[in-house]
From Swiss-Prot:
Major subcellular location class: membrane
Gene Ontology terms: cellular component: plasma membrane
A GO biological-process term: sodium ion export across plasma membrane
The entry's keywords: ATP-binding, Hydrogen ion transport, Ion transport, Magnesium, Membrane, Metal-binding, Nucleotide-binding, Phosphoprotein, Potassium, Potassium transport, Translocase, Transmembrane, Transmembrane helix, Transport
Annotated segments matching region Disordered: 1-51
UniProt-recorded name of the protein: Potassium-transporting ATPase alpha chain 2
The species this protein was found in: Rhinella marina (Cane toad)
GO molecular function, one term: metal ion binding
Cited PANTHER family: POTASSIUM-TRANSPORTING ATPASE ALPHA CHAIN 2, SODIUM/POTASSIUM-TRANSPORTING ATPASE SUBUNIT ALPHA
Complex formation: Composed of two subunits: alpha (catalytic) and beta.
Length: 1042
């Protein structure tokens, strides 16, 4: 969350309204991440933590206690615990480590891949094949092994795709492991009055611990002594500003007070000593870890859809199988043969190639997205992003550039706009006036930040600087303007300095000047604007010092309010040339007694800073809105800043008003405004803390544009759950440890690749390698495209199922020789159809893909009624008729006219019948009949392949004409078309195929018998799409668009 920090420099009130710093105590005392109070009640808690309990935000009181009270509470002292007492507490509380979640054994993970979704259907098919083979083998040891081979192939398909999916999933690491990586290994502790270095896991409540710059905090500490100590809380709270730590109780909120240091955060500088008040799972990070491990693991939308599809296919297969089992029994077949028919029909309905197709398609899309800076960890998350209807986005680093930047300046009684673009090379304000030169000099000199060495060739805005975010922003601004800040500093040698502190709220330094004609020393100062103004009696206007009268104070206040209202951090700057007579170059300045003027200074101007929006974000937010996706900002930053950024990126659009805006416009109290009149809402974490679920649902439902500010990790999780209660598919972005529970709970968690913590990355399903919100929109489009393309692929695959099923039904009902064998069907499903099915992964989006509303859960299905009816009863029937025509043509040309085939099956299949007559009296031996049957298989197979060529082309689009889409733009689809013909020709004409796989060489004319039906399929589908486009919303559109 980068620069969402608060620093005391900016913690100043504007007419009673807190500016951009720490919020008002009364309003904000319960905000941020409240610490779980250690429960000392005697009642025993179950080991398994209740996630709802973890979401409760309770208070910690230890920061309010004196040292004596702490010693009494934890039975400790400034001499530390005794070793014996520490051992007792360690035995009672356990080690200072995070309890790992109960892991799933790898074998279980592997087996889940083997039996989930499509896999279960294929296993069922394989088992049924083996059962059928077993039954036939028991009757006749010389029976065909087709069913045996088919079962083996189905099992191999499941195992291979399962292994592929398992290794893909295995790349993601355990969330808790990344938390443990953040934990310090050693700690310096005082025990028995002596300092010891012990493993951090052996620390207990009451231990007295010392930390220094560079150390990680080994437990939650109540600081009792500190010297220049600053900590980095960014991994926990998202605040990147270094936070000072001291023994003072400064705030009701444990996160805001200075005398608490948190487990796993980093001590940046200085030293500190404190009592351990929480260890392991009781620490804040322990609670977050438990919260992250206790949520999530819901099925992805695509997993739900695949499960739904499996139910449909299984339902159709079993229903049709049972129906024809009954028909077979009624027609006099034995129960055993009827069971064989039942199994054959069920297996014929199983889309054997679809599991591999979906897995490969998702993988290909994941690779394509990686090239667009979206790294997908969970394959199914590819599609989930396309289903997203709400994006809960972090502010800093995602919507913004994650760097403080000078945005506005106020000098000479005018507000000037600075360039906040990535390179800041186009500042439009006038840089020649004397006032500007004076202001620029103060900004350059009154600054402790410095560039690291060895960056001469690095662009200014990308140079690494040592200093906090605000100081760095001022340094880079000065460097862009002046060209060489270090040169200015060397020409204006620093004589003495008072660093910023929270009491004074200003920074001061005294310098020699670079003017050889002027020997006076220059005092420069910056700090909280009204504190700086208090120290001034004059103001520089047009290069001249004028009295600071009420008129100028009003101008200052107006400018200050305007910049503060933009959510910007404002600093004031002033200077004073010290009289040479009183302060010669040899004067001994004393910063303790401050033996130099700190009043009657000359006010020069204001600078305001903000973490500016990324240039690509407004357009991305607009695209989301047109795609029906609501973008909600969820940030830990101040509401004013959050609202300003939300307006600048379009999350709150130009004409939208919040309740506060309406009250201000109508000049009425906020309470009198009807909240539903406000299109936008800015919800403070304090308000959210007191809301019921129904009130939160009301906000999510009735406000189109929402910003949540000052939120804690628990609240972010509650927001995600609130969105999911509305049946939204929720995407969440985050980068800190504090974001991991919400990332895990969301339908798709998106972590930042650059600024993100390991914990956030492991909790997420997707990682943005460039931390850019615009990449999410790219991902949404890819996700929608993959859903469309999987739907097209399923439609393509299902169509030929009818043509594969009908031969078995006619075989049973009409008693004709079998038109196509199971091995032949297998070569369609896992041979000619695989490459074309996968080629849909490369199909471009149709024009309306980002103008559609997000698909609705459980309504807009992957396989809906329209798709099933169109594939099975329309295109599927056409294919069947064409294939049967070719089969009967082959049989007729060889002597068996269609009417003579009806009822011939039993005689045809008798091995000892060597003189079966055809329509012309010719006699056929069993081996001759068998070769002719295989020729019928091949003709039927070739007909399906030819018709599938047309089916492949028409599936390129669902609404647009294929000519609008571009018939030959998808090179992989052309490869798919070619592969079908090549594989079919190879199987038909390769020597030894008749006896190995039951394919025979076909005469050339048989390849063209089904061609008119292929053309009919193409024309029929183009007419369907034309009517859909021409009559939107009509009966045709509703029933023919799948």
């Amino acid at each position: 969350m980068g620069t969402e920090a608060n620093s005391d420099v900016y913690s100043t009130a504007i007419n009673g309204i807190n500016e951009i710093g720490y919020p008002d105590k009364e309003k904000e005392e319960d905000l941020g991440l409240e610490v779980q109070k250690k429960k000392e009640k005697k009642q025993k808690k179950k080991k398994g933590k209740n996630v709802d309990d973890l979401k409760q935000e309770l208070d910690l009181e230890d920061h309010k206690l004196s040292i004596e009270e702490l010693e009494a509470k934890y039975e400790t002292s400034l001499q530390g615990l005794t070793s014996a007492r520490a051992a007792e507490i360690l035995a009672r509380d356990g080690p200072n480590t995070l309890t790992p979640p109960k892991g799933t054994p790898e074998i279980i993970k592997f087996l889940k891949q083997m039996i989930g979704g499509f896999s279960l259907l294929l296993w069922a098919g394989a088992i049924l094949c083996w059962i059928a083979y077993g039954i036939l083998y028991a009757q006749d040891h010389n029976t065909s092994r087709d069913n045996l081979y088919l079962g083996i192939v189905l099992a191999v398909v499941v195992i291979l795709t399962g292994c592929f999916a398992y290794f893909q999933e295995a790349k993601s690491t355990n969330i808790m492991a990344s938390f443990n990586q953040m934990i310090p290994q050693q700690a310096v502790v005082t025990r028995n009055g002596q300092k010891l270095e012990i493993p951090a896991k052996d620390l207990v409540v009451g231990d007295l611990v010392d930390v220094k710059g560079g150390d990680r905090i080994p437990a939650d500490l109540r600081i009792i002594f500190a010297q220049g100590c600053k900590v980095d809380n960014s991994s926990l709270t998202g605040e990147s500003e270094a936070q000072p730590r001291s023994s003072e109780f400064t705030h009701e909120n444990p996160l805001e007070t200075k005398n608490i240091a948190f487990y796993s955060t980093t001590c940046l500088e200085g030293t500190a000593r404190g009592f351990v008040i929480n260890t392991g799972d009781q620490t804040i990070i322990g609670r977050i870890a438990s919260l992250a491990s206790g949520v999530g693991n819901e099925k992805t939308p695509i997993a739900v859809e695949i499960e739904h599809f499996v139910h449909i296919v299984a339902g159709v297969a079993v229903s049709v199988g049972v129906l024809f089992f009954i028909i077979a029994i009624c027609m006099g077949y034995s129960a055993l043969n009827s069971i064989i028919f039942l199994i054959g029909i069920i297996v014929a309905n199983v889309p054997e190639g679809l599991l591999a197709t979906v897995t490969v398609t998702l993988s290909l899309t994941a690779k394509r997205m990686a090239k667009k800076n979206c790294l997908v960890k969970n394959l199914e998350a590819v599609e989930t992003l396309g289903s997203t209807s709400i994006i809960c986005s972090d502010k800093t680093g995602t919507l913004t550039q994650n760097r403080m930047t000078v945005a506005h300046l106020w000098f000479d009684d005018h507000i000037h706009i600075a360039d906040t673009s990535e390179d800041q090379s186009h500042h439009s304000f006038e840089q020649t006036p004397e006032t500007w030169n004076a202001l620029c000099k103060i900004v350059s000199l009154c600054n402790r930040a410095e560039f690291k060495a060895g960056q001469d060739d690095v662009p200014i805005m990308k140079k690494v600087a040592v200093g906090d975010a605000s100081e760095t922003a001022l340094l880079k601004f000065s460097e862009v303007i002046t060209g060489n800040v270090m040169n200015i500093r060397s020409q204006n040698r620093k004589v003495c300095e008072i660093p910023f502190n929270s009491t004074n709220k200003f920074q001061l330094s005294i310098h020699e000047t670079d003017d050889p004609q002027d020997q006076r020393l220059l005092l420069v100062m910056k700090g909280a604007p009204e504190r700086i103004l208090e120290k001034c009696s004059t103001i520089m206007i047009g290069g001249k010092e004028l009295p600071l009268d009420e008129s100028m104070k009003d101008s200052f206040q107006t400018a200050y309010m305007e910049l503060g209202g933009l959510g910007e951090r404002v600093l004031g700057f002033c200077h004073l040339y010290l009289p040479e007579e009183e302060y010669p170059s040899s004067y001994a300045f004393d910063i303790e007694s401050m033996n130099f003027p700190t009043s009657n200074l000359c006010f020069v101007g204001l600078l305001s800073m903000i973490d500016p929006p990324r240039s690509t974000v407004p357009d991305a937010v607009t695209k989301c809105r047109s795609a029906g996706i609501k973008v909600i900002m969820v940030t830990g930053d101040h509401p004013i800043t959050a609202k300003a950024i939300a307006r600048s990126v379009g999350i709150i659009s130009a004409g939208s008003e919040t309740v506060d805006d309406i009250a201000k416009r109508l000049n009425i109290p906020v309470e009198q405004v009807n909240k539903r009149e406000a299109k936008a809402a800015v919800v403070n974490g304090g308000e959210l803390k007191d809301m019921s679920s129904e009130e939160l649902d009301d906000i999510l439902t009735n406000h189109a544009e929402i910003v949540f500010a000052r939120t804690s990790p628990q609240q972010k999780l509650i927001i995600v759950e609130g969105c999911q209660r509305q049946n939204y598919v929720v995407a969440v972005t985050g980068d800190g440890v504090n974001d991991s529970p919400a990332l895990k709970k969301a339908d798709i968690g998106i972590a930042m690749g650059i600024a993100g913590s390991d914990a956030a990355k492991n909790a997420a399903d997707m990682i943005l390698l460039d931390d850019n919100f615009a990449s999410i929109v790219t991902g949404v489009e890819e996700g929608r495209l993959i859903f469309d393309n999987i739907k097209k692929s399923i439609g393509y695959t299902l169509t030929k199922n009818v043509a594969e099923l009908c031969p078995f039904l006619i075989y049973i009902i009409a008693d004709i020789p079998l038109p196509i064998g199971t091995i032949t069907i297998l070569f369609i499903d896992l041979g000619t159809d695989i490459i074309p099915s996968v080629s849909f992964a490369y199909e471009k989006a149709e024009r309306d893909i980002m103008n559609r509303k997000p698909r609705r859960k459980n309504v807009d299905r992957l396989v809906n009624q329209q798709l099933a009816l169109y594939a099975y009863l329309q295109i599927g029937i056409i294919q069947s008729v064409g294939a049967f025509l070719n089969y009967f043509t082959v049989m007729a040309e060889q002597g068996f006219l269609p009417h003579t085939l009806v009822g011939i099956r039993i005689d045809w299949e008798k091995i000892n019948n060597q003189d079966l007559e055809d329509s012309y009296g010719q006699e056929w031996t069993f081996s001759q009949r068998q070769f002719l049957e295989w020729t019928g298989y091949t003709a039927f197979f070739v007909s399906i392949v030819v018709e599938q060529l047309a089916d492949l082309i028409i599936r390129k689009t669902r609404r647009n004409s294929v000519f609008q889409q571009g018939l030959f733009r998808n090179k992989f689809l052309l490869m798919g078309l070619a592969s079908q013909v090549i594989i079919a020709a190879f199987l038909s004409y390769c020597p030894e195929m008749p006896y190995a796989l039951k394919f025979t060489p076909l005469r050339a004319q048989y390849w063209f018998v089904a061609a008119p039906y292929a053309l009919l399929i193409f024309v029929y589908d183009e007419i369907r799409k034309l009517f859909i486009r021409r009559y939107p919303g009509s009966w045709w559109d509703k029933n023919m668009y799948y």
